[in-house]
Amino acid sequence: MVEIIGGGILGLTLAYELLKQGRQVRVWERAPTLGGLMGRISFSELDGMSCDRYYHAILSSDRTLMHLMAELGLRERVGMVATKMGFYHNGHSYPMTTPLEFLRFPPLNMLDRTRLAYTILACRQIKDWRALEQIPVADWLTSLSGERVVRNIWAPLLRAKFDGDFSQVPATYIWSRLVRTTDTRTRGGSQELMCYLPNGYQELIEALATAIRARGGEIHTGTMVDQVQVVNGHAIGLLVGGQELASDQIVITTQTPIARRLLPPEAAEVSTGWGRLDGYLGIVCMLLVLRQRLTPYYTLNITDPSIPFTGVIETTNLIDPACVGGYHLVYLPKYVAPDSPYARMGDDELRTTFMRYLRQMFPDLRDEAIAAIRIGRERYVEPLHPLGATDRIPAVQSPIHGLFLANTGQIYPQLTNGESVCSFARQVADIVASQSRSAAGTRIKPDVTMNLL
């Protein structure tokens, strides 16, 4: 029996892949529902309308994810839409979707635009990313794009993404992001194609759960795993609600700080090793359900440092509003460090603050256009990979025989998204299924972890 701790998309995909290879699995999820960050939220005041708690994109280039959805019978339900992107700069919104709009972007002169275009093209040509992980992203971007482009475009975006401090962020971050997003462009770059499921990622979560149960797997929700049991360097089972359950192998898919709490004193050395790379940013996100469209953009990036949220993401410019009761969904995310004042704000204060800045951007937004508001919070969302992080990434198989760690912090240099998580889960399944319990220390090498390029 393989125990999988965590019922998010990583844990469920891993369980599904292991079942395909003939292994018995049990999935443990402490929340009452599956999906983790990709779960749904319901609005009783809107006749039970539900939508994704947070926004999640499916790109037209997400090959592993598309293959998984095809296996689960979802491929025909995937819609594809040409979306628009904009930039909010100095109090104005500018379209930045087509090459012509790019050339007209006022904050940049012709030389700046040329250098920005060169940066994007240069990223596409880089196949070996290793040298980039030792270079601070700001230094690398300055060498390619120039100081004006960094000051007006890159630095504001990086400050927003990393809650102000991106001094230790390696160049691999921008490289990976640009390579993935430019893969969605049509020939000539005039359109950006994105995909969606009518009922969001919950469709994939439910399809995975159905497939797991159909193949004999077990799923336990609303159940807290107390501790991994270790004897003489072997993981022998779990302690769940005071009951000891014998296991052959255990895979922890939770974020590293949570995973470390599950280890007993006998695993102190492993915990220390995992702790070498366990930094995460959290997120606070205000979701507005509107009765009318706010912008024409799926993503409106923000370069104004006074505005607290990272961007304005209007997902109903991708998904059909009919999928969410005819409403329009706007997400205002802010990534937060543990000591950020926004992480400590109460819901009412956060709502008031975000609405003040949103109305500064959109003065025509009226109260009667707002059907509902929700505040979402998560402590561990974005794993932090500082300069030279590769050697600090924990091995999938730990030195304790039969104990594995598999979470988003080990996905590198690719960014955390549905595609990279599903691809990672497939490769972890191969390791768990094929390696004997006597072999320890196998690491998925970062350069072969993902198959996105």
Segments and roles (model prediction):
Residues 13, 108, 117-231:
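Active-site/ligand-binding neighborhood in enzyme catalytic cores
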Residues 19-44:
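Glycine-rich FAD pyrophosphate-binding loop
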Residues 319-325, 378-405, 409-412:
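FAD-binding beta-loop-beta segment adjacent to the flavin cofactor pocket
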Residues 407-432:
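A conserved FAD-binding loop/helix module that cradles the flavin
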Residues 1-27:
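N-terminal Rossmann-like FAD-binding beta1-loop-alpha1 element of flavoenzymes
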Residues 10, 33, 257:
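Conserved Rossmann-like nucleotide-cofactor binding loop
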Residues 46-129, 156:
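Dinucleotide-binding Rossmann-like beta1-alpha1 core, especially the glycine-rich loop
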Residues 21, 224-330, 334-343, 348, ...:
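Mid-domain catalytic core of redox enzymes
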